């Protein structure tokens, strides 16, 4: 079953496929406390359900399917149990989508911009991640991270984010395993993983970053369940293809069009 990687018990929407909302990284290791200053945690009702990426002092990039009511955003967080001194909390001031927030039938526009209710300041554990200056190349070694599940078969969630290196693959590698979904021949989606399996994002990791060449190149979107199966890589929204839309929204052009 394809999984939208968000915590199942938080899903109110009737989805035709499962996205990685609340996926944990599988096959990785605990992230170094200083390597994820841009990583944010999305909470609702005290439950961490998605990740996101701080792209400047006022804006967070995440997946559209991570949209829920009463979102709280934690920045500068490492351990869920032991707060950093410079942790900050925000709530959304505005949210922007390429699609209606309730429409997930187009697999390649799973993207949401959140404007924070007030800007954050850079600190020891908070700093934005650069948007891409060019698209990533197939074969690139990329890195993804999150507080999602760390077991493909058990509901095991970590206290601190886990990081894993995966490879950028041909899009067809994500399209071929799922003929029943009739995915388009071309897509604004990146395909990434390890073909032999064992390394992947998972439930709870949705919305988190795929980092290639030190830039925010992808947004964790969907993948198979169980996670980390051989020849079942995961899909990430391609940030570069949405760059004009992102920059227009941030500049105040809220009527900006999404890429076709």
Curated annotation (Swiss-Prot):
It is an enzyme of class 3 (hydrolase). Residues 1-18 form the signal peptide. GO terms for biological process: proteolysis. InterPro entries: Peptidase_S1_PA, Peptidase_S1_PA_chymotrypsin, Peptidase_S1A, Trypsin_dom, TRYPSIN_HIS, TRYPSIN_SER. Glycans are attached at residue 103. One of its GO terms (cellular component) is secretory granule. Disulfide bonds join 31-163, 50-66, 98-258, 142-212, 174-191, 202-227. It is found in: Secreted. Its main location: secreted. Residues 19-24 form a propeptide. Monomer. Snake venom serine protease that may act in the hemostasis system of the prey. Belongs to the peptidase S1 family. Snake venom subfamily. This is Snake venom serine protease pallabin.
């Amino acid at each position: 079953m394809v999984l939208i990687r968000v915590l199942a018990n938080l899903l109110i929407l009737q989805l035709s496929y499962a996205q990685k909302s609340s996926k944990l990284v599988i096959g990785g290791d605990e992230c170094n406390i200083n390597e994820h200053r841009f990583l944010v945690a999305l909470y609702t009702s005290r439950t961490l359900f998605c990740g996101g990426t701080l792209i400047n002092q006022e804006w967070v990039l995440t997946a559209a399917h991570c949209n829920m009511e009463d979102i709280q955003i934690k920045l500068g967080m490492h351990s869920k149990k032991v707060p950093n001194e410079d942790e900050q909390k925000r709530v959304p001031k505005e949210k922007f989508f390429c699609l209606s927030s309730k429409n997930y039938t187009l697999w390649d526009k799973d993207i949401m911009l959140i404007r924070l209710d007030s800007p954050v300041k850079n600190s020891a554990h908070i700093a934005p991640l650069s948007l891409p200056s060019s698209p990533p190349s197939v074969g690139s070694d990329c890195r993804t991270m999150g507080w999602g599940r760390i077991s493909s078969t058990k509901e095991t969630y970590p206290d601190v984010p886990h990081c894993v290196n995966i490879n950028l693959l041909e899009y067809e590698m994500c399209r071929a395993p799922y003929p029943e979904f009739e995915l388009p021949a071309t897509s604004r989606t990146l395909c990434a993983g390890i073909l032999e399996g064992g390394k992947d994002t998972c439930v709870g990791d949705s919305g988190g970053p795929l980092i290639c060449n030190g830039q925010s190149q992808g947004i964790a979107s969907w993948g198979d369940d169980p996670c980390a199966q051989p020849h079942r890589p995961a899909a990430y929204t391609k940030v570069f293809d949405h760059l004009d839309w992102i920059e227009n929204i941030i500049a105040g052009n809220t009527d900006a069009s999404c890429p076709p």
